[in-house]
Curated annotation (Swiss-Prot):
This is Aquaporin-3. The gene is AQP3. Gene3D superfamilies: Glycerol uptake facilitator protein. The record marks 63, 212, 218 as: Selectivity filter. InterPro entries: Aquaporin-like (IPR023271), Aquaporin_3 (IPR023275), MIP (IPR000425), MIP/Aquaporin (IPR050363), MIP_CS (IPR022357). Pfam families: MIP. Aquaglyceroporins form homotetrameric transmembrane channels, with each monomer independently mediating glycerol and water transport across the plasma membrane along their osmotic gradient. Could also be permeable to urea. Also participates in cell permeability to H2O2 and H2O2-mediated signaling. In skin, transports glycerol to the epidermis and stratum corneum, where it maintains hydration, elasticity, and supports lipid biosynthesis for barrier repair. In kidney, contributes to the reabsorption of water, helping the body maintain proper fluid balance. It comes from Sus scrofa. Residues 1-24, 75-78, 93-100, 178-189, 265-290 are cytoplasmic. Homotetramer; each monomer provides an independent glycerol/water pore. Could also exist in other oligomeric states.
Amino acid sequence: MGRQKELVTRCGEMLHIRYRLLRQALAECLGTLILVMFGCGSVAQVVLSRGTHGGFLTINLAFGFAVTLGILVAGQVSGAHLNPAVTFAMCFLAREPWIKLPVYTLAQTLGAFLGAGIIFGLYYDAIWAFANNQLIVSGPNGTAGIFATYPSGHLDMVNGFFDQFIGTASLIVCVLAIVDPNNNPVPRGLEAFTVGLVVLVIGTSMGFNSGYAVNPARDFGPRLFTAIAGWGSEVFTTGRHWWWVPIASPLLGSIAGVFVYQLMIGCHLEPPPPSTDEENVKLSQVKHKE
C-alpha cells in the first residue's frame, strides 16, 4: 500500500503542469465537456424517445445540474467560467487578464465539441435509427437539435438576437451578484449550486424561442461537431444562417449585463465592515508586558 501511494504521488508530480494558464485551460475544457455531455444527453434522450423519456423540464433540470457539476469539477483551478460570455465579462471588469479570453474560449469550445462527440457515440445507434439511417438537421426527424440550438419557426432574426441578448445579460447580472463579496455573498461551496439554479430559471422562462444557448462555446462546439459528423454545412445555413446569433448576441449581452449590474448595484455597494471575530483573534494574540 505504501509503495502504491508513493508511485501515485510520483506519477502526479511527473504529470503536473507548471504553466498555470494551461492548467486552467484544461479545467475549462473538462468543465464545459461535462456541461455539454449531461445537457445534450438529456436532449438526446427526449428527442430520440419522442418525448417518452423526458420533456422540457427534464432538459432544463439537466442543464442546470450540468452547470453545477462543471463548476464543481473546474472551479478550484480555473474559476469554471464554462462560457466565453462569462470570461468576457470578467475580463471587461478587469477581474481576469485579457489573455484568458482567447485561451478560455478555445478550451471551452473544445470541451463542448468533445462533449457532443461523447453523446453522439453514446446514442449512435439510436440517432441512425431515428430517421431511417439519415442525419437530418431539422423537421420531425431532425437530430441536429440534440447538439446545438436552432430557432423555432415563429422566431425571426431580430427577435432571436434579442432573445439571446436578454438571456445572457440576465445570466451575467446574476453571476456577478453571486460572486460579489460586497453584495450578499453565497455561502462558500454553494456558488456552483446557485449558478446552476440561475441556468435552470433562465431555461424554464426563456427557453421556448431557441433553446437558450446563452453560451457561444456550448452552441458552436457541438454545431461544428455535427457539421463534421455527417449533418454537413446545413447546420450553419438552417434558420436563415442562425449559427452566428448564439455567438455574437451573448457577447453583447455580456457587456450589457456588466453595465446593468455595475450601474445599478455594484458601484453603490460599500465594503463590509471588518469582522469583530477577526479583531478579537488578533487582539488575543497581542502579548502584554507584565
